[in-house]
Amino acid sequence: MNIALLKSKIHRASVTEARLDYVGSISIDEKLLQASGILEYEKVQVVNINNGARFETYTIATQEEGVVCLNGATARLAEVGDKVIIMSYADFNEEEAKTFKPKVVFVDENNTATKITNYEKHGSIF
């Protein structure tokens, strides 16, 4: 049996752009992708903290510092300045799942990584 677990998370990133006339996806600063362990073209779930919207798309790396840009139809699901959580998941067998820890990247208002952990605590942003 395989179990899907949180693999990587970029927490409370600010949407910097929303481009409706684009093929699709979410463009993310390549430094954030590297810090989180999310790969380019990897499927991600995005949760908009401001309006509760949840959607899936794939990532595109950009060299533009601090960029988190919703492309195509997903541009309708957030406004510039909205806070989002970007998550990827992976399947593990039961033994792997018992010891696996996700990579969680916390960012500031400029989408610069401020803290990287491998855990989350109930009731705490950090």
From Swiss-Prot:
Task: List the catalytic activities from the record.
Answer: L-aspartate + H(+) = beta-alanine + CO2
Sites of Pyruvic acid (Ser) modification: S25
InterPro entries tied to this protein? Asp_de-COase-like_dom_sf (IPR009010), Asp_decarbox (IPR003190)
Q: Which organism is it from?
A: Campylobacter jejuni subsp. doylei (strain ATCC BAA-1458 / RM4099 / 269.97)
Pathway this chain belongs to:
Cofactor biosynthesis; (R)-pantothenate biosynthesis; beta-alanine from L-aspartate: step 1/1
Subunit and partners: Heterooctamer of four alpha and four beta subunits.
- Function text: Catalyzes the pyruvoyl-dependent decarboxylation of aspartate to produce beta-alanine.
**What general EC class does the enzyme of this chain belong to?**
lyase
Name of the protein in its database record: Aspartate 1-decarboxylase
Report the PTM annotation.
Is synthesized initially as an inactive proenzyme, which is activated by self-cleavage at a specific serine bond to produce a beta-subunit with a hydroxyl group at its C-terminus and an alpha-subunit with a pyruvoyl group at its N-terminus.
Keywords assigned by UniProt?
Autocatalytic cleavage, Cytoplasm, Decarboxylase, Lyase, Pantothenate biosynthesis, Pyruvate, Schiff base, Zymogen
Question: NCBIfam families, from UniProt?
Answer: panD (TIGR00223)
Q: Into which family does the record put it?
A: Belongs to the PanD family.
Where is this chain's protein located in or outside the cell? Cytoplasm
Q: Is the keyword Signal in the record?
A: no
Keyword Signal applies: no
Q: Where is the active site?
A: S25 (schiff-base intermediate with substrate), Y58 (proton donor)
Q: What is its EC number?
A: 4.1.1.11
Provide the disulphide bond pattern: none
